[in-house]
Regions:
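Glycine-rich phosphate-binding loop and adjacent beta-alpha segment
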Residues: 218-287, 320-321
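A glycine-/small-residue-rich N-terminal strand-loop-strand element
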Residues: 66-90
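N-terminal glycine-rich beta->alpha transition that marks the start or flank
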Residues: 11-14, 19-66
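C-terminal capping/lid region of NAD(P)-dependent oxidoreductase domains
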Residues: 287-294, 302-321
Length: 321
């Protein structure tokens, strides 16, 4: 099979598209021929060497995608060759063939395309647990969403509005502000302006109930924009490492800092299936809109990495084998 690999950490230039051995599946796995593969910031971090990678080179990135079953293991009885399957937490996805454990194989309804599934699963499941588990959104809440034009940001906006809350989005450009408004945000502030002050004005001096913080380097400012007793949910650091937070500030202001990691939520097959199918239901009933993705061939994966790193993209980037 063909795969997008790398031998050493570095820039997108280290990525190579080459022939490697097909995966050999275990009895409890299926062999999936991928039709669409999601690109995520975690792939960037791993390519740079910022995240741990198991095994030895050549490394294969990716852990989200969808496709058609080619073969099933001897212990798999409820999945058959030809079935449409998606996955959100399986390694080595940047390849034509992926071995998927049966408990991580999410059945794909006919109404959901491979492109939509690979656009929404990881980011949609992230937005789902952030608004359900990390901080349960209530009607009337004021919510600040960082990187509001990104894939998670646009889905967060829609789910938050679905729950009856007010959304303030943060973006890096007026073009991205348009994407955030299209997703349904009530206000947009730009990183290049005095956004903390703007948010305090919008909230009549109180601050927001919760901040969904995915930039990292803006963590201190996020707390300044949060009301007394409010919450900051830290779930990413696309803009760099955060400055240390003084726990005395948390005590004095009764503010809460909480973290979020999808893998601590998707611990069972039922969790994966139930949460995924709620996303699929929202999409098929028109409650959740998924922006058309930007697609690259798997062979041109380095260009996809460059676009994602540039922070000029909006919505999801997909690799097509």
């Amino acid at each position: 099979m063909k795969a997008l690999c790398f031998e050493q950490f570095g820039s997108p230039d280290v990525l190579q598209y080459k022939e490697i051995h097909d995966p050999i599946i275990n009895p409890n796995e299926i062999l999936l021929r991928t039709k669409a593969i999601g690109l995520n910031f975690a792939d960037i971090y791993r390519r740079r060497g910022a995240y741990h990678l198991a095994g030895n080179p050549p490394y294969i990135l990716g852990y989200e995608g969808s496709g058609i079953v080619e073969q099933v293991g001897t212990e798999v009885t409820d999945i058959a060759a030809g079935d449409r399957i998606a996955f959100a937490d399986v390694p080595f996805a940047n390849a034509e063939l992926v071995a998927v454990p049966k408990e991580k194989a999410i059945p794909l309804p006919d109404a959901i395309s491979f492109e939509v599934a690979s656009s929404v699963l990881l980011q949609g499941l992230t937005a789902h647990y952030l608004t359900q588990d990390s901080y349960k959104i209530k009607a009337g809440d004021f919510v600040l969403v960082h990187a509001a034009a990104g894939g998670v940001g646009q889905l967060l906006i829609q789910i938050i509005k679905m729950k009856g809350a007010h959304v303030i989005g943060l973006t890096s450009s007026k073009e991205k502000a348009d994407a955030a408004y299209s997703a349904g945000t009530d206000h947009v502030c730009l990183y290049s302006e005095s956004w903390c002050e703007e948010i305090l004005q919008i909230t009549k001096g109180h601050g927001v109930d919760v901040v969904y913080e995915s930039v990292g380097s803006t963590l201190e400012e996020s707390f300044k924009a949060t009301k007394i007793g409010g919450t900051v949910v830290f779930y990413g650091m696309a803009g760099g490492d955060p400055a240390p937070i003084d726990p005395r500030m948390l005590m004095d202001t009764s503010k809460t800092l909480t973290g979020g990691d999808l893998w601590n939520v998707l611990t069972t097959y039922e969790e994966r299936k139930t949460r995924s199918h709620q996303l699929f239901d929202w999409i098929t009933t028109g409650k959740l809109h998924v922006q058309n993705p930007t697609t690259f061939s798997l062979e041109n994966g380095a260009d996809a990495h460059r676009l994602l790193e540039s922070r000029k993209s909006t919505g999801k980037i997909l690799l097509i084998p």
